[in-house]
Amino acid sequence: MHQYQDLLERILSDGAEKTDRTGTGTLSVFGHQMRFNLSAGFPMLTTKRLPLKAIVHELLWFLKGDTNIKYLRDNGVTIWDEWADANGDLGPVYGHQWRSWPAPDGRSIDQIANVVDMIKRNPDSRRLIVSAWNPAEVDKMALPPCHCLFQFYVANGKLSCQLYQRSADVFLGVPFNIASYALLTMMVAQVTGLKPGDFVHSFGDTHLYSNHLEQAKLQLTRAPRALPVMRINPDVKDIFSFRFEDFELVGYDPHPHIKAEVAV
């Protein structure tokens, strides 16, 4: 995954020093794009180990429309703990907006169900979009969505996805986001009878926190290894019916984990 290594190098060489909400400080660039051909392997970072369990369960949690961390905690995933309130609630974050976007007339809009249906009925549509950025509810969210809008595209029997990420924690968050949306693209492709195409990752404020710089430099000393293969249970034909057991990552041989503190 040279694309990710190239991004680390760009930020370290060209990044501007900026302050941020957490008070940590960042090196930041504005505007970047990476493209991953999903037929060339599953884009799971190999220059450090990533936890597949957390990535898959978080995505399934989003697709459930859930915004309480109980499901995550029950499955040993703690990545949202810092932002939850005493009851485990996060407010109307990703899952709520994906599955229950509130309409002015009181209805709830299931954006995921709608986009899957539209891909099947009108694959050439330019409206195959899901948005998590709801200005009316941002202030109620424990953390406003960083990966805030994605669009699907169908051509030659293949499904591609482009994600726009307004704010990108490149060392900790972005590797998760790449794997998560690549997997989502593969899942949607399967349930719509298509092959996976490309995952395109577009960024706004693209940054390394100041307490991640040495870790990023260490990661750049490591050569990327061959990408693994993601196997998905072919019997699942409904986007909301996937379970953790339906996914198998084959041939994942990463370099060791690199510890870094999350900026809250």
From Swiss-Prot:
The active site is at 146 (nucleophile). Pfam families: Thymidylat_synt. GO terms for molecular function: thymidylate synthase activity. Pathway: Pyrimidine metabolism; dTTP biosynthesis. PROSITE patterns: THYMIDYLATE_SYNTHASE (PS00091). One of its GO terms (biological process) is methylation. It comes from the Bacteria. Keywords: Cytoplasm, Methyltransferase, Nucleotide biosynthesis, Transferase. Its EC number is 2.1.1.45. It catalyses: dUMP + (6R)-5,10-methylene-5,6,7,8-tetrahydrofolate = 7,8-dihydrofolate + dTMP. Transmembrane segments: none annotated. One of its GO terms (cellular component) is cytosol. DUMP binds at residues 21, 126-127, 166-169, 177, 207-209. InterPro entries: Thymidate_synth/dCMP_Mease, Thymidate_synth/dCMP_Mease_dom, Thymidate_synth/dCMP_Mease_sf, Thymidylate_synthase, Thymidylate_synthase_AS. Gene3D superfamilies: Thymidylate synthase/dCMP hydroxymethylase domain. NCBIfam families: PRK01827.1-3 (NF002497), PRK01827.1-5 (NF002499), thym_sym (TIGR03284). Homodimer. Belongs to the thymidylate synthase family. Bacterial-type ThyA subfamily. Catalyzes the reductive methylation of 2'-deoxyuridine-5'-monophosphate (dUMP) to 2'-deoxythymidine-5'-monophosphate (dTMP) while utilizing 5,10-methylenetetrahydrofolate (mTHF) as the methyl donor and reductant in the reaction, yielding dihydrofolate (DHF) as a by-product. This enzymatic reaction provides an intracellular de novo source of dTMP, an essential precursor for DNA biosynthesis. This is Thymidylate synthase. The gene is thyA.
